[in-house]
Amino acid sequence: EIFDLDTIMQRLHASIVNNPSAKAAVDMAVYDLYAKTLGQPLYKILGGAKQKIETAHTISAKPTDEMLRDSLQAVQDGFGILNVSAGKQALKDVENLLAIRKAVGPGIRIRIEADQCWSPQEAVRIISTLEDKGMQAELVEQPVKAHDLTGLKFVTQHVQTPIVADESIFSMKDALHIIQTQSADLINIKLMKTGGIHEALKICTVAETYGVDCMIGCMLESKISVSAAAHLAAAKNCITMVDLI
């Protein structure tokens, strides 16, 4: 029975340990069938909060001139938010980010994807330097290793720029721990990490309870899973940031 979602999802998540991407594929198919059976788009069934969402455009870590070219092209294409990837060279990261800010101007929102590249102390030093130089980054994603929650909290407590937990969160329990310990300011939800929409909705409920905003992102995925993420983003008011390109 397609309307017995809880039972279906309990069986799905009990069927195998880990493998969240495989679970997500089944989860999304179930929710798609659920919505089609009701004759409504999925985002309306899940909450229907928004008619429009705005995604950031990812700028991959490359030589400075290539990152500048990609950033300017994204702005020319109409993107108002850039998600800029960092590397493993602190001075080069600072140089690249400041060069991009200067090139695109103050009207473009810039988010920093640190991708676990820095130590806690290095992260504080880099982010503080960027703050002092007027970078005005909207946020920094996962500045330290996913398992280093003590380090994540250290960074969050020592900088002004909001810190996002990404790879540190796979489940509602992970999100609850991060929020209760104030280890990060924001939560990044990815359906390939959570095992699909069902667990992502639980994370949204926790975030809403504590008044914490969420971002929704993606990995290297098909348009099917990215579309599912877009529906979830449109459904929930707690998802205030989108990074699906």
PLM regions: where:
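Active-site beta->alpha loop and helix N-cap motifs at the rims of alpha/beta catalytic domains
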Residues: 40, 57-69, 73, 90-94
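A generic structural signal for well-ordered alpha-helical segments
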Residues: 34-35, 156, 207, 233
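Metal- or metallocofactor-binding catalytic centers and their adjacent structured scaffolds
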Residues: 1-37
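Catalytic core of soluble alpha/beta enzymes
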Residues: 84-225
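N-terminal small/glycine-rich loop or linker at the start of catalytic domains
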Residues: 36-61, 96
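Gly-rich Lys/Arg/Thr-decorated short loops/hinges at beta-loop-alpha junctions or inter-strand turns
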Residues: 50-55, 74-81
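Flexible, glycine/charged-enriched surface loops at secondary-structure junctions
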Residues: 2-6, 41-45, 137-143, 218-219
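Flexible C-terminal active-site loop/helix
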Residues: 219-245
